[in-house]
């Protein structure tokens, strides 16, 4: 759930930033994060285990909120680059769903609309076992959207998995809205008016620096002259306007097997 088929090695480093901010020293966790940083992807199971270990270091605290709040544009990968170049929050959410559908052939997330708001939610049956994972994912998403669309990310409600904590104030203060727990469809409801608010004229002062930072991050993963990246870009630019940028079609266009393309992505 939460936009995750896999966790990128770069995204996992938000946990390291959290450790630095909290002044936490854990050789075991540091070693595991160092290993994760060298990998293109980290399994969801391994990420959950890292989060459980972090939670044990700070019992009773809203660790998921703290870790997710550390996200920066360089942690968001290619999807982050697409969201960064969206016109508003609504466009960003629809862009994500489009990418999810085209590349995986299915939408794990569900985007619904009514007169007051837009709700993005994911099915989740794991309850407490997935609570911190869900908190980190939703907090990171909101943090990123607030960085990109100041004034366009007003929330009406948030639902999370897991038991209700004794102190819900940190959650309500961060999200700025009522927060419920024990949900099997965790998600976020955005204000229907704010979500359509154009970002033109309301960009954060550091927007261009953020965009350059993201470009540099992508260049580190695949240099500007990388033939794979150039070929992928060419095929996507040709396929998306035709409404057919599916994983099989992109693989054929690049003369790769589906398995090879998935691994390279």
What is the meaning of each model-derived region?
Residues 1-118, 140:
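N-terminal low-complexity or simple alpha-helical regulatory segments
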Residues 74-194:
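N-terminal regulatory/effector-sensing and dimerization cores
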Residues 165-265:
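Extended mid-to-C-terminal alpha-helical interaction segments
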Residues 9, 13, 90, 131-139, ...:
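Short, well-ordered alpha-helical segments
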Residues 22, 61, 103, 148, ...:
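Solvent-exposed amphipathic alpha-helical surface segments
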Residues 1-3, 126, 217-221:
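A ubiquitous short alpha-helical element
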